[in-house]
């Protein structure tokens, strides 16, 4: 880490300046700091930042200054910043999917432009500021990353009150938060799979319909029996070769199933292609969430 001193930015136009109260450390920050993601077979996917860029995208702070075109936010109030900011000009941005903006043109805080590991953060528009309600200062910023990631992944499963048909793999911070959101926002109690008994016990306490230890040799049979023939959707918050191997066995003979891949542990995985067609199955990557989904999530938080 290197300390860098800059003049405090002065917002103009639609820009706003936020004084950082707290900024979380995301696991992807570690990958970015390390300079790569694991592509399997010894391959590394580069993730190095430009020199002297300030990291940090889970930002919560106090609004201290605004540009002359800003009118809908309040100086002195605390806000969570939506960090997945696009160029505003490409098709993805114009369709409300700024988080899908090209990495060559995106303006993601802490990834493409200076982020929250600093005293102040300059944000290009007031629309990226969100009231966090009564959320604790040290947790509020995480709603814009892990909270949004979990919420968006859950929406992609298209599950509707089928608690024993949705499996969450990984009972870490993301998985546990997804479990809470599934219960509160979707009225679903997913089953949860992990290799850590302590995490599984916590998941059960928080309302999982059932928990399963992935180290058990008969875990697939256990899940199949509980779910009456296999699940309809899996959200994988680990993203390893081992979890994909396990997760794709959990569907049984069910058709139209969805595998939502979120975790970035890394690796490489091979598929039996005809089974994808015969089973009408979908494997879908899920990357953070849209600005509209952030509005939905923060409405739930408040």
Give, region by region, the residue ranges found by the protein language model:
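Glycine-rich beta-strand-centered segment in the early N-terminal region that forms part
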Residues: 7-23, 38-91, 133-135
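NAD(P)H dinucleotide-binding glycine-rich loop of Rossmann-like/cofactor-binding domains
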Residues: 45-52, 57, 87-169
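Local beta-strand N-terminus motif with an aromatic residue
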Residues: 76, 163, 208, 229-232
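N-terminal Rossmann-like NAD(P) cofactor-binding module of classical short-chain dehydrogenase/reductase
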Residues: 80, 232-235
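Mid-domain Rossmann-like dinucleotide-binding core that forms the NAD(H)/NADP(H) cofactor-binding site
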Residues: 128, 133-217, 221-222
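C-terminal substrate-binding/catalytic core of Rossmann-like NAD(P)-dependent dehydrogenases/reductases
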Residues: 224, 228, 265-302
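Glycine-centered, small-residue-biased loops immediately flanking beta-strands
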Residues: 255-258
């Amino acid at each position: 880490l290197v300390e860098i001193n800059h003049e405090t930015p002065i917002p103009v136009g639609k820009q706003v300046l936020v004084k950082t109260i707290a900024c979380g450390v995301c696991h992807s920050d570690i990958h970015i700091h390390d300079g790569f993601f694991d592509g399997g077979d010894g391959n590394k996917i580069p993730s190095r930042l430009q020199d002297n860029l300030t990291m940090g995208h889970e930002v919560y702070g106090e609004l201290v200054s605004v540009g002359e075109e800003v009118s809908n936010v309040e100086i002195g109030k605390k806000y969570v910043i939506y960090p997945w900011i696009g160029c505003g000009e490409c098709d993805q941005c114009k369709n409300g999917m700024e988080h899908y903006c090209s990495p060559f043109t995106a303006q993601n805080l802490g990834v493409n432009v200076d982020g929250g590991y600093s005293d102040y953060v300059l944000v290009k528009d007031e629309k990226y500021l969100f009231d966090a309600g009564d959320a604790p200062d040290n947790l509020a910023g995480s709603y814009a990353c892990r909270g949004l990631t979990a919420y968006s992944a859950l929406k992609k499963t298209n599950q509707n009150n089928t608690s024993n048909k949705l499996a969450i793999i990984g009972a870490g911070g993301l998985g546990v938060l997804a479990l809470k959101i599934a219960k509160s926002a979707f009225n679903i109690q997913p089953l949860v799979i992990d290799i850590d008994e302590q995490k599984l016990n916590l998941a059960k306490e928080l309302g999982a319909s059932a928990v399963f230890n992935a180290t058990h040799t008969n875990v697939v049979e256990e899940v199949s029996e509980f779910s009456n023939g296999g699940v309809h959707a899996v959200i994988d918050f680990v993203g390893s070769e081992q979890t994909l191997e396990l997760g794709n066995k959990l569907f049984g003979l069910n058709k139209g199933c969805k595998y939502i891949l979120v975790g970035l542990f890394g690796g490489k995985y091979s598929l039996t292609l005809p089974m994808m067609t015969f089973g009408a199955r979908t494997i879908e990557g899920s990357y953070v969430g849209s600005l509209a989904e952030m509005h939905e999530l923060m409405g739930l938080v408040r």
